[in-house]
Amino acid sequence: MEVRYEKHWSGHLNREMEFKIYGSSGKPVLFIPCQAGRFWDFEGFNMDKTWAPWIESGQVMVFACDSIDNEAWAALGADKRWRIENHEKWFNYITTELVPAINHFCYQANGYVQGIMTFGASMGAMHAANLYYRRPDLFDSCFAISGLYDNKEFFGDYCDDLVYNNCPVFYLPNLPEDHFYMDMYRNQKSIIVIGQGAWEEALLPSTRQLDTICRQKGIPTRFEYWGFDVNHDWPWWHKMVPTYLPWLLG
């Protein structure tokens, strides 16, 4: 497996941001780490081995990015506006700086540019879903595992424009039927998977809420609920990837 390390300056975040690329051709996949995680977690938690059949066969190239959750979602004692502004800077880094870099690498590898799949577990799933639902023009598929899709756990009753814009269960119900994103959702694939065992209980309500919203809006996101023995942990996430990745790529 070809692995490449990159470090690029981010004007939005005013710092260098690191990422790794796994593979040499195929559909681009953006991996977002768990809460306060780093780009190396894709490799550190052996997810590269789980994805290896698709990476080594040239079906996907995985781009593992960095988070700044410790300055945003996980900075619970800090000013809420400051935290969500930091997250929005990260969102803009992803969409206006990292995505063009991904497109550049993919054009070099494949000879063309295509939509990017978002992938993550836990808080990485929240980011993956939010990126997909906010920018389906950039991200044409989503694979979110064991995520939280409202932000009350992190922001309580506080809500401003940026909190609203980063919470799918807030903004999706108000998306007009004639918005061009609706056609994009309906012609793309997305899946949200969750267990019902230990440490998943707090995540199930927002998952079910998002499930209901998508059904009401006619957004064909696929929701899969695994058993009560399925915990919020990497061993289960490793099992979920080969179960659904062929469908997403099909």
Annotate each language-model stretch with its function.
Residues M1-G250:
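Non-catalytic cap/lid and distal C-terminal segments of serine-dependent acyl enzymes
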